[in-house]
Amino acid sequence: MESAEIRRRWLSFYEERGHTVVPSASLIADDPTLLLVPAGMVPFKPYFLGEVKPPWPRATSVQKCVRTPDIEEVGKTTRHGTFFQMCGNFSFGDYFKEGAITYAWELLTTPQDKGGYGLDPERLWITVYLDDDEAETIWRDKIGVPAERIQRLGKKDNYWSMGVPGPCGPCSEINYDRGPEFGVEGGPAVNDERYVEIWNLVFMQYERGEGTSKDDFEILGDLPQKNIDTGLGMERLAMILQGVQNMYEIDTSMAVIQKATELTGVEYGAAHGSDVSLRVVTDHMRTSVMLIGDGVTPGNEGRGYVLRRIMRRAIRNMRLLGATGPVVKDLVDVVIAMMGQQYPELISDRQRIETVALAEEAAFLKTLKAGTNILDTAVTETKASGGQVLPGDKAFLLHDTWGFPIDLTLEMAAEQGLSVDEDGFRRLMKEQRERAKADAQSKKTGHADLGAYREIADAAGETDFIGYTQTEGESTIVGILVDGVSSPAATEGDEVEIVLDRTPFYAEGGGQIGDTGRIKVESGAIIEVRDCQKPVPGVYVHKGVVQVGEVTVGAKAQVSIDVRRRKAIARAHSATHLTHQALRDALGPTAAQAGSENQPGRFRFDFGSPSAVPTTVMTDVEQQINEVLARDLDVQAEVMSIDEAKKQGAIAEFGEKYGERVRVVTIGDFSKELCGGTHVHNTAQLGLVKLLGESSIGSGVRRIEALVGVDAYNFLAREHTVVAQIQELVKGRPEELPEKVSAMLGKLKDAEKEIERFRAEKVLQAAAGLVDSAKDVRGIALVTGQVPDGTTADDLRRLVLDVRGRIQGGRPAVVALFTTVGGKPLTVIATNEAARERGLKAGDLVRAAAKTLGGGGGGKPDVAQGGGQNPAAIGEAIDAVERLVTETAK
């Protein structure tokens, strides 16, 4: 039975029994405690916790899941995989143990021609929790499972919880006996390789408290209602129904193995080591495609790191199998072909998935060889010194410079019999993060110590921000810092940081830079505010200089921002939102914001994309943005619950932690984002947006630079002036410029070719004369000399090789020519095969010459290049070459 049919029968069976079919949620968990969805119940977690009332009493789903804790075991065992599909049925206060058990038995044992899976009841074994008499009674008396095939196990095996206080309960597992060829008999309590678990029924009826381990926690009492959460591993059931040895050989996986064998020429089943690599490739490529399909892009943190890690393991294992060229596209295509029937969105999104995967493959292949060489050298050095642990600094170098995930280094070191100093590696990583954090903080505050700000916050409370509705107001100074130290007062000329009880100044955050302005103290003192930061939550710090008078803590003040500057920043920030939405419209949801900076009249916007955005797409994005400006759309901000924001479709990183209340900025019917920044009131106030271009700032991240309003107009005006000047030079209209400039460049290229031809002729003429000057040194035809100054390195090399080629008759030949370029000596030396057979290598000769010239050089045995600092020593260098030829020639 094909996997797609297993899935169809599952959903059909439960739908016929009153369950609502719920589509698989994204692998990107809508839960700040999870990177990825690891189980079928995760999307239903709010219902089990009682946070949200379920819209139906019964539900069923086939949920995409990813688990990576046992990634090193993938391929080595038949039970570990990173991607799997969890078939689940759920009851929220409806049926309980008897209903769940009855449904499960019916679906598993009903003959296939009657809609079931047709498993032999005699091969099914049951485990129940140690004290769960009720479940055992149902299995034995209601279902008819013999008592000898029901086993009781403890909390570790048959009691489920999420690992934290919350819902929990005993569970009952259904296991399938694969037969004596898989090990000794005795049931799942004895051999879980032979008696493989296929279905877990969780009877969620209690609430657990704190605990120290999986089987050590307190049961606090009953839940308000009893729930059912079951999970059947589709891949494990497919393994049984398709009669194969392991999960890697089922229909949706075997096709990938076959493609990998086709690409490498290594047959599956030929050897244990190659089989492990083939299974790793199969599992990891399936997982990669599903993750990319759900919007994950490779990166160095979070779920992006998970994807990068498994993709690079797959690529490296293909290299171990003998692949030499790119392989990812072929593997991606076969995964989509296999999984597309169940998840048609993979087919429609094929181009984007391929683009992301190919970009990661290209990035890794650039560093794989060099990184592997670094690792091999480190391993050799470690072994030579008698060590068994690869130093942490080597692992850090591989990660930081060559993009090797630490897991890959661990694996490759283990293959050579070494462990890795993980503590040392993590210490260096921590130091790097702390340096970056301190650098970023010191750039904002001038120092990295935040204690003074916290003391002010503890004493005076958080700053009341009034800047959404006011640009000026009355305030009280509650804190003064001079050189990062709290002070009761500051005087004229002091650089200060002022904390107010209330302020209209926006503190840098969310990509928007801080406001500037003035603080006028009641005593007459004036502070010019040059920046506003929020170094700790809730504390607004106004950085500036006391221009007049003395400032004291507790003084009343009139504060005002630079309104013109604020408006220019607001235009940039609103334009950023429009750009974000236009990019998502053009490229899809993966063009998610990765960073931004909004300044007066200009902004930059970073977003996820595996490759450069075509110019035509950028043009369309810019046009769409400016069309929105012309629609005079209102811009509104509203504070609401995070759940309401999600419901309204507001763009946000919902994997991040937000408070219960969030601010949502809506631009007409075009854009809706969570945002704490300041904005225009209407899109017409932006005037004009001009995208200057986009570029790469890292793997999978692109950056757009843009201008807004008057700055955009001034840019276009300058461009118009430049175009007019070019028109005057080439005597053409604007629309003719590309053709005319192209023609001029063509003529220039032709002229360069003609110059190159003359240069080549000059080299040939010089070569003929040099051959005639060859000197016989112990049977070696030695040509030496100095050619005119200014001869390029390429021309000198071309001349040397031409002279070498003109020495006929099989005579051993050495050609050593010198010149000066930019006042510094340069030499190229070449030997023919006959000379090399007599022990003369170009690299050795160049090093001897370059040493005399006060420099260095090297190259291959047949041709090498060197240079130095002393052109006056060229004659001595020629003599050094001749001496070495005389001494070395055999």
Swiss-Prot record:
Zn(2+) binds at H573, H577, C675, H679. Its EC number is 6.1.1.7. It comes from Streptomyces avermitilis (strain ATCC 31267 / DSM 46492 / JCM 5070 / NBRC 14893 / NCIMB 12804 / NRRL 8165 / MA-4680). HAMAP family: Ala_tRNA_synth_B (MF_00036_B). It comes from the Bacteria. Consists of three domains; the N-terminal catalytic domain, the editing domain and the C-terminal C-Ala domain. The editing domain removes incorrectly charged amino acids, while the C-Ala domain, along with tRNA(Ala), serves as a bridge to cooperatively bring together the editing and aminoacylation centers thus stimulating deacylation of misacylated tRNAs. This is Alanine--tRNA ligase. One of its GO terms (cellular component) is cytosol. GO terms for molecular function: alanine-tRNA ligase activity; aminoacyl-tRNA deacylase activity; ATP binding; tRNA binding; zinc ion binding. Its cofactor is Zn(2+). It is an enzyme of class 6 (ligase). Binds 1 zinc ion per subunit. Gene3D superfamilies: 2.40.30.130, 3.10.310.40, 3.30.54.20, 6.10.250.550, Bira Bifunctional Protein, Domain 2, Threonyl-trna Synthetase, Chain A, domain 2. One of its GO terms (biological process) is alanyl-tRNA aminoacylation. Catalyzes the attachment of alanine to tRNA(Ala) in a two-step reaction: alanine is first activated by ATP to form Ala-AMP and then transferred to the acceptor end of tRNA(Ala). Also edits incorrectly charged Ser-tRNA(Ala) and Gly-tRNA(Ala) via its editing domain. It is found in: Cytoplasm. The gene is alaS. Belongs to the class-II aminoacyl-tRNA synthetase family. It catalyses: tRNA(Ala) + L-alanine + ATP = L-alanyl-tRNA(Ala) + AMP + diphosphate. Keywords: Aminoacyl-tRNA synthetase, ATP-binding, Cytoplasm, Ligase, Metal-binding, Nucleotide-binding, Protein biosynthesis, RNA-binding, tRNA-binding, Zinc.
